[in-house]
Amino acid sequence: MITLTGHTLTIEEMKRLLLEGEGVTACPNSMQKVAECREVVEKIVEDGKVVYGITTGFGKFSDVLIQKDDVKALQHNLIQSHACGIGDPFPEEVSRGMLILRANTMLKGVSGVRPLVVNMLLEFVNRKIHPVVPQQGSLGASGDLAPLSHLALVLLGEGEVFYKGKRVHAMVALTEEGLEPIELEAKEGLALINGTQAMTAQGVLSYIEAEATSYQAELIASMTIEGLQGIIDAFDENVHKARGYKEQVEVASRIRDILHDSKLTTKQGELRVQDAYSLRCIPQVHGASWQVLNYVKEKLEIEMNAATDNPLIFDGGEKVISGGNFHGQPIAFAMDFLKVGMAELANISERRIERLVNPQLNDLPPFLSPEPGLQSGAMIMQYAAASLVSENKTLAHPASVDSIPSSANQEDHVSMGTIASRHAHQIIQNVRRVLSVEMICAMQAAEYRGIENMSTVTKSFYHQGRQQVPSITNDRIFSTDIENITHWLKTNYSIKERLDVNAAL
């Protein structure tokens, strides 16, 4: 059970919450702050003060005063009218993440909701009732209004949820779990939907997958180095310390650890003086992608614990301030950066695939074919990888450079952070598939070189891979092989924990 405080949630905890289904509880001190802040909101309503989002309309309607008797209706109308999401739903892990992050930000005690609302969010998490939230429709400011409105709907007993492996009406799940839908009161609708939790939840899942995929890329690249009898000197510690990037040094160190007892690597001048960049520069390129990941992790952990509501309530109600913490620009930039960093792992992987299949670049059978000419072998697998790499280049276009005005120009600059976050996740899926092609080719090359000559780590990795796909002895439908390896990487070597090279033993 992980305790939410509003201040301390980490990526490592999110891994346990999203991927292992661990439960959550609220810190009592944080809940006390929630209750105290709620008293301020109720006094504002009782006194008839004019405060945005509590006793006024929203967006362009911020100048419209709402009567006391209409405050509850205002919140309900807000949720229904803003539930304009479009398209396929977010993965269930993402909607679970939205619930967790929304509760966590409310526990900072500046949003003005009742403890009841926080408790309801936690009930949904712990009972694994996950909102069906369409992926499209958010501008990323004022936060993720449309996606979070779909999240808020289910608290009211409206909309749909994922529950026990099915997609059902929210009331079906609530009834089975013995829960009563809530009725929103002053400010609570706005507090539920004004934030960046859709882009951030998707970003967290993307980061977790990207981290594991990056470790996998090093293991697969190591197998390729063996298949091409690469020069191990290029990974010497002195070379990488001379440049000074710790991530580059760490990648080189892991590659050396993976290949320390390999009989397939060569020394400088033994077969050739130096290797092509796609082998020789693995630490420099992969290390740079790790720099991106470290940046993204830092920004995500800030946002996971951020108050992104509007208005925010401070000093016991002395200050009720309309600000712009809902603007998703920091996450938009981080997700665009993640897109570039991950796309580059696919770029260099595809070039290693080319070196494995091109007979002009190695002494292996052309396209790793068992009967070159009669059988095409891995020829079109390289095509498929090249296609994914090119698709990534389109997806990597920064969403954050775009903005379009909304709400009659009141909201005249937006982040497009949710688009960036969604595209980052798509890129990561493509990267995993490109790496799957590289792994298939590298395993085949290893067989020609002699499996007995592989390092202890890569040999174990090879045998596990061969449980997913057989050796290429005849042409077959290789699409199945690619998907089998992709699924295996994602579900077994995948996003549940950091890949330790020793885990392959």
Curated annotation (Swiss-Prot):
Keywords: Cytoplasm, Histidine metabolism, Lyase
Post-translational modification (record): Contains an active site 4-methylidene-imidazol-5-one (MIO), which is formed autocatalytically by cyclization and dehydration of residues Ala-Ser-Gly.
Modification sites for 2,3-didehydroalanine (Ser): 142
Origin superkingdom: Bacteria
This enzyme's EC code(s): 4.3.1.3
Chief place where the protein resides: cytoplasm
Single GO cellular component term: cytoplasm
Keyword Cytoplasm in record: yes
Alphabetized NCBIfam families for the sequence: hutH (TIGR01225), PRK09367.1 (NF006871)
Family from the record: Belongs to the PAL/histidase family.
HAMAP family assigned to the protein according to its UniProt record, in alphabetical order: His_ammonia_lyase
Protein name (record): Histidine ammonia-lyase
